[in-house]
Amino acid sequence: MESIEQQLTELRTTLRHHEYLYHVMDAPEIPDAEYDRLMRELRELETKHPELITPDSPTQRVGAAPLAAFSQIRHEVPMLSLDNVFDEESFLAFNKRVQDRLKSNEKVTWCCELKLDGLAVSILYENGVLVSAATRGDGTTGEDITSNVRTIRAIPLKLHGENIPARLEVRGEVFLPQAGFEKINEDARRTGGKVFANPRNAAAGSLRQLDPRITAKRPLTFFCYGVGVLEGGELPDTHLGRLLQFKKWGLPVSDRVTLCESAEEVLAFYHKVEEDRPTLGFDIDGVVIKVNSLAQQEQLGFVARAPRWAVAFKFPAQEQMTFVRDVEFQVGRTGAITPVARLEPVHVAGVLVSNATLHNADEIERLGLRIGDKVVIRRAGDVIPQVVNVVLSERPEDTREVVFPTHCPVCGSDVERVEGEAVARCTGGLICGAQRKESLKHFVSRRAMDVDGMGDKIIDQLVEKEYVHTPADLFKLTAGKLTGLERMGPKSAQNVVNALEKAKETTFARFLYALGIREVGEATAAGLAAYFGTLEALEAASIEELQKVPDVGIVVASHVHNFFAEESNRNVISELLAEGVHWPEPIVINAEEIDSPFAGKTVVLTGSLSQMSRDDAKARLVELGAKVAGSVSKKTDLVIAGEAAGSKLAKAQELGIEVIDETEMLRLLGS
């Protein structure tokens, strides 16, 4: 049996290894929850045996040593970490400790913030001018990232307003909105660049570039949450007051900061944020709860690595470790072959996960994944679970290589990978049962033709029984034929037939989206429908003319042109129209005749809107003569930026495109 000293040494060595991977290499090997568990185990042992605590124990310091490639900045005031709680009982115990330590009847008010999942930084302003910036590093010394921080547009290079201190060190989190993270990885997969496991790693990797020009291209943003150095000036005597003052000076502060008068209000805030988490547009892993009064903070003081007046209340882990039992290959509606990891079932963020996407062959190679490996699984919001990384230090001896198929696992056709593309595809087309099934499921989906009651299992049976080969065949189905399907009685069958009849009346945009043309999503379909107005005009369009549509480049234009050039596709469209599929005649909007500040402009919406839905905003803009695009380009005239706007806002600023916020949009809509 190991001695206490051996257990402590082993735990400290393991934690230091993972701290180095997380803080220095930006390549964590284990989930945060596993790190937290190890840290709790170490802290509990040290609490029982305080005589064995060493000055270099992970419980006594923060982070890891800085990279040698950066010069170093010593923090004048140490950048400490926060203690964590993981459930209501632990938070209430923390609340009681605070009340007991203050030993007074004075009320405690809590300032609650989002716990952003990014990289902690300190930014020093002298006479209102940004002079330096550093990472947290080991809490005492960080890396000099001044040049990179200066490229982040959310961070002012000069504060504005009155009574700015002579020296002010602001602390906060640099992070990457989810939209920006997805765009970076999408570009990386296309070009063979580095794919990041999550937004936190992407933010850290972007901020710690030796070339600031690379950082400048990444849509990083920033929220401040505290103060380090303060000289030659004053700040309010509450934490919230300080954040509001920062905002007046031009520093970005989250609008979700909330003052809570009791522990019950704090718990309500925690649960509301947890509920809103999937819609925020950026990653958080909990909430931070701080005593609002600076005087009370001073009374409470600090322990070795954290303040006694604050705590991080973390959400259930979104990452867990498990084993890959097998890798199977699925075929999508465009023939894309997607590897899927079959996992030893594990609960992640409250959901039992047994499968995770592996994206493509490049991703398997990047991960170095083998069947039998121990892996970290991540599930965030509604995102499909994915393998974040392989725990190489715990690789079993009997793992097997993952062999990507050369023939379709469904129809046996050749698998082809076009040069420059990450995706391998089955060449079978509609002779492939899997492609046929997925194409039909897309066609009847809610945002396409919206056939109520026609679920995936019905489509599967229709294809397997050879009742349906093309979308047009769906409209030839009778209640009698449907009744022969599993779990389909006469009433249900008639309901499906009625839903198919109702679906015949649609819109041109929905119809185009339902056809499943490669790279044509809802926004692009709407843009094509608005620009060409009729099916005949779209079918006759050249690749050059297609590129005049907002959001349509050479790749999408080629896919659209090739789709309509294919005789079998034109035949399916003719059959659909013959079965009665139709849509209203286009209403031609002449922008020149509309008296509106949006008339004739190409507009892009980004971030979340609070006063109206995105669909309502799009519809209103189109009514006023705007063309609404899905991405920012040189053709864009105006960007409307809501909360947590990401890469689109950064690109607009880079291109010098006019940007307005939601308040200004509403004013102009009403003018």
UniProtKB/Swiss-Prot annotation:
UniProt function note: DNA ligase that catalyzes the formation of phosphodiester linkages between 5'-phosphoryl and 3'-hydroxyl groups in double-stranded DNA using NAD as a coenzyme and as the energy source for the reaction. It is essential for DNA replication and repair of damaged DNA.
Protein name from the UniProt record: DNA ligase
GO annotations of cellular component type: cytosol
Active site annotation, chain numbering: 115
Family, as annotated: Belongs to the NAD-dependent DNA ligase family. LigA subfamily.
Domain BRCT: 593-671
Cofactor field: Mg(2+); Mn(2+)
